[in-house]
Amino acid sequence: MDAAAKSLGATELRSSWRKGKKLAVLYRGEWIHFGALGYEDYTTHHDDDRRASYRRRHKAILLRDGRPAYKVKTTPAFWAWHLLW
């Protein structure tokens, strides 16, 4: 997963120290925490139907400027989409 994060532009990937989050990436000098603790993700359950459902739901999350959140590297949604799902 570390190699995947670096290929997406992250400098570092660590376990999150923020309550309720799984991971954190260092991207452009800012830490971005993502992934809810206590919930499974595709890396743990490998269920293609659940992955498709997650992606369908999260495609609908838009930023104020109308861009999908999962396409913007400064959002937790981007990192969860690419590293966990």
Q: What kind of region is each of these model predictions?
A:
Residues 1-85:
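Arg/Lys-rich, low-complexity, intrinsically disordered basic segments
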